[in-house]
Amino acid sequence: MNKIKDSFLIQDLETLSGIKAHTIRIWEKRYNLLSPERLNRNIRKYSLADLQKLLNVSILYCNGYKISKLSLLSDEELHETARKISLESVQSNYNVNTLIFAMYTFDGDQFDKVYNELSESMGFEEMFVKVYIPLMDHIGVLWQTDAIKPAHEHFISNLIIGKIVLNTAEISSVTSEDATIYVLYLPVGELHSLGLLFLNYCLKKRGKKTVYLGGGIPFSNLETLNTKFPSIKWICSFVVERTREEKEAFLFEYVDFLKKSDSSSLIVGRVMEEVSGKEEFKERITFFNSFKELPFFE
């Protein structure tokens, strides 16, 4: 079983906070900013408390506060000042940092606290775009640098998914004159459903009729829907990297499927960028690198 990460090297702090390791070391020596445990002459081990403090310091430092002043504040004062900055500036990453810390400590209550505070000043769609997307982007970096375990990513992703489902359920049914049914699915091999779930929420919020299928859906299953609905707009997303040959094989098969039903599709995912220019695909498929590029958000 993987041990939950509760201690960090200075390289971990650099990755998580965006503050260079050299700068962190200078702040330690000059201002006694952090209190690491010294393992030997050159290696220091930092605690979760050190991480939380540095995350708050990084927010305030990036907002113009002098490190000499910040070093004089208590941990509680740093936390409260960073929180106030977040309320004054939508661009502040205070909430992202708070959620990263909640992820490390598996603190669902802290996640809900941030959600409830944000809900007082913005809608869920704005919250997702301004907080959850930057959070997941940052988590992607942490994953690539081996700074987090799968348990961390699964924990925070499932909390966000829970909020998407909650907000989707609260949308009142709207009778739309548009007969198009938007069918959202993940192809076989794709398991990252968070973005697609959010898109389903956004479509419903805009009065669109949707069918959300989730992940691992083969073409044979999709054909069943053609017998149920006369007008379908298919939407799928890709995150998992594939070879060029695998991408083209999927798209050729997909285009044949779309032609049979005289339908079209939107595909979201930067991984398809290298093959998206082929004329054979453009007739039936429109490609987007990210969900934010979709026409629903114009």
Task: Write out the residue ranges for each language-model feature.
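Short, amphipathic alpha-helical "recognition" segments used to contact nucleic acids or chromatin
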Residues: 1-5, 57-58
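Polyanion-binding surface elements
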Residues: 3-23
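Short, contiguous strand/loop micro-motifs
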Residues: 11, 44, 86, 185-187, ...
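Long amphipathic alpha-helical segments
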Residues: 16, 20-25, 29-172
